[in-house]
A protein has these predicted regions:
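Phosphate/nucleotide-binding beta-alpha loop and adjacent structural elements of enzyme active sites
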Residues: 1-156
Length: 156
């Protein structure tokens, strides 16, 4: 098992535990079933911890060019990006990143602006169309953001 971050070493992965009841009445419990996380701000009511190795993507030997990276790490996005910065700059892949304020308590714009600084534009999909994110509205319910290199030629 390996988790990506901005350092190499070991950490604890929090795994939400399933209720013994087959019938789910708590919506939050349904959410937590797929929400394992190494991010310290994520708190679960009922979980177990498992030691996992963490590594920077920059330190993983990759021989082929990378064209696409998907990141869904429940609040640990900036750490993964920092640990993958050289890989991202050298390959300039399309990035699909889930970013939600509820995981970090930080504004979504903080993560978006950080990624834009390394040469990307940010988009979200609405009605099967890529919409450029220039300024997010307060109540906008987007969480999957596409980051395309600024020089990306798109036929969309």
């Amino acid at each position: 098992n390996l988790a990506l971050s901005d350092t190499n070493g070991e950490t604890k992965l929090k795994l939400p535990l399933r209720s013994k009841s087959f019938f789910k009445t708590n919506i939050e419990e349904l959410y937590q079933l797929g929400a394992a996380s190494i991010h310290p701000n994520n708190q679960f009511d009922n979980f177990k911890e498992v030691k996992v190795e963490i590594k920077k993507l920059d330190d993983v030997k990759i021989v082929n060019k990378i064209g696409f990276i998907k990141i869904d790490v429940e609040g640990h996005e900036l750490e993964v990006i920092e640990g993958a910065k050289n890989t991202i700059i050298n390959n300039m892949p399309i990035l699909l990143i889930e970013i939600e304020k509820r995981h970090t308590k930080e504004p979504v714009e903080k993560s978006i602006n950080h990624i834009k600084k390394i040469g990307y534009e940010c988009y979200f999909v609405k009605n099967e169309e890529l919409i450029l994110v220039d300024k997010l509205k307060d109540k906008q319910l987007e969480n999957n953001y596409y980051f395309l290199p600024r020089n990306f030629k798109q036929d969309l």
